[in-house]
């Protein structure tokens, strides 16, 4: 085991000098004793002359030149398997929930090759989420990849928590949650939410939160993914939740300049597409088992063309776009039904009825969008009878796309609703065909199934 010395410390980036004949490989883990703390460094570059450039997986406060550094001769390894269920771990797989050792039987390196092309499998099976707008407009595939896109404060985390609650309770498999650069409070809420709904023993939690150094945030997604891969390779259907994939990119941006790379567009790292690809190519389903992943993607300044969200789009099967405009109308979940897409929305996969209903809803909403300008200038009276009907139905559909969430009961005061796909299709089809033209539009706001809207109308 070779030993080197620290020669330079700049923030999270540490340069270490080793003997010329014992230089560590790229991605090898190094260990340094920083006071009472054990700090792990990960090799990023070999600079020549026996010097390697590393990223610290923890705070580099108190590090100084001349400290001894040990080469562990392998990449960062984390515990995998059933021992991780119900536990909260950090980027190195160390427990942070004060419940003692993990007691794992096996450790895996966080850097692994993606499955080969022959091993990949393609599933057309749908995953019902119980959220009307998602099941109808952008259905999820079992073993598929879903992105929740949205700016600050439009409900990415709440939507993600509702999905976890619905899927983890309805779906009996294992889940892995990777909190990448998000708020510690949300991590805490999430843990208690899981404990209260008795699913904590089926979830492994890995956190690298906002207050942690960029090294932790850059690698914690890989830690969570490695745990999910182990469950998949045991032949299970596993769910992987990542909140938030943008912070993974951002952590790379933070260390990119310190690593001596030239920034590219908008100041992102030049290796943005490659780093995203390395992560996304591993989140995949094989012939042995599947990984269904839901990833929250922060959209800087609500600009979907920003390089970071734009790079993520290419890897996904379904995109759920949350819109500030819809949130400002008080419609939650604030999913934009015209902007959200799914590869599964195909008559061969979802069936003709579902496909026609979804496309019908889109065309009514699209027409309403076009008529809005006319209404704003001339008022409703100038519209033709046909257009007035379209507007009335569109406003009902818009309100019917809202739904009370289980995880938001505390804020809304109304009990959460799980709506089956069958009921969702029936409800929207009925509105489009004019069965509910006589009901006031308020009746459709924040209800579950169409029967509830009819009941609500009686009380109005």
From Swiss-Prot:
Q: What is the protein name for this chain?
A: ATP synthase subunit beta
Gene Ontology MF terms in the entry: ATP binding; ATP hydrolysis activity; proton-transporting ATP synthase activity, rotational mechanism; proton-transporting ATPase activity, rotational mechanism
UniProt keyword annotations, A-Z: ATP synthesis, ATP-binding, Cell inner membrane, Cell membrane, CF(1), Hydrogen ion transport, Ion transport, Membrane, Nucleotide-binding, Translocase, Transport
Matching PROSITE patterns, A to Z? ATPASE_ALPHA_BETA
Q: What does this protein do?
A: Produces ATP from ADP in the presence of a proton gradient across the membrane. The catalytic sites are hosted primarily by the beta subunits.
Query: Where does it sit, as one GO cellular component term?
Result: plasma membrane
Localisation: Cell inner membrane
């Amino acid at each position: 085991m070779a030993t080197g010395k620290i020669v330079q410390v700049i923030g999270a980036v540490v340069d270490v000098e080793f003997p010329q004949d014992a230089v560590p490989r790229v991605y090898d883990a190094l260990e340094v004793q920083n006071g009472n703390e054990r700090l792990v460094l990960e090799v990023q570059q070999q600079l020549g002359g026996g010097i390697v450039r590393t990223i610290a997986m923890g705070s580099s406060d108190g590090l100084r030149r001349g400290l001894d550094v040990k080469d562990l001769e392998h990449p960062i390894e984390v515990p995998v398997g059933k021992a991780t269920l119900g536990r909260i771990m950090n980027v190195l797989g160390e427990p942070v929930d004060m419940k003692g050792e993990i007691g794992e039987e096996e450790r895996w390196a966080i850097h692994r090759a993606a499955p080969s092309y022959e091993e990949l499998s393609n599933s057309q099976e749908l995953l019902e989420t119980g959220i009307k707008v998602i099941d109808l407009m952008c259905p999820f595939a079992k073993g598929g990849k879903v992105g929740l896109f949205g700016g600050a404060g439009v409900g990415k985390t709440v939507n993600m928590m509702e999905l976890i609650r619905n899927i983890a309770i309805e779906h009996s498999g294992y889940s892995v949650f990777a909190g990448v650069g998000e708020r510690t409070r949300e991590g805490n809420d999430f843990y208690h939410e899981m404990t209260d709904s008795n699913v904590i023993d089926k979830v492994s939690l890995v956190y690298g939160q906002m207050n942690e150094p960029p090294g932790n945030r850059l690698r914690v997604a890989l830690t969570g993914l490695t745990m999910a891969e182990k469950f998949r390779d045991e032949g299970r259907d596993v769910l992987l939740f990542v909140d938030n994939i943008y912070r993974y990119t951002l952590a790379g941006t933070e260390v990119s300049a310190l690593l001596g790379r030239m920034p590219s567009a908008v100041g992102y790292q030049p290796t943005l597409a490659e780093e995203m690809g390395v992560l996304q190519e591993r989140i995949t389903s094989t012939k042995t088992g599947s990984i269904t992943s839901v990833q929250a993607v922060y959209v800087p300044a609500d600009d979907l063309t920003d390089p970071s969200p734009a790079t993520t789009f290419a890897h996904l099967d379904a995109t759920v776009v949350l819109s500030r405009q819809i949130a400002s109308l008080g419609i939650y979940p604030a999913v934009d039904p015209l902007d959200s897409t799914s590869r599964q929305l195909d008559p061969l996969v979802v069936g003709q009825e579902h496909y026609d209903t979804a496309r019908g809803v889109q065309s009514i909403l699209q027409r309403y969008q076009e008529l809005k300008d006319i209404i704003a200038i001339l008022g409703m009276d100038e519209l033709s009878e046909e257009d007035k009907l379209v507007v009335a139905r569109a406003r009902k559909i818009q309100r019917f796309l809202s739904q009370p969430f289980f995880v938001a009961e505390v804020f809304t005061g109304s009990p959460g609703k799980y709506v089956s796909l069958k009921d969702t299709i029936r409800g929207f089809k009925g509105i489009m065909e004019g069965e509910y033209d006589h009901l006031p539009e308020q009746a459709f706001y924040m209800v579950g199934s169409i029967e509830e809207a009819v009941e609500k109308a009686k009380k109005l």
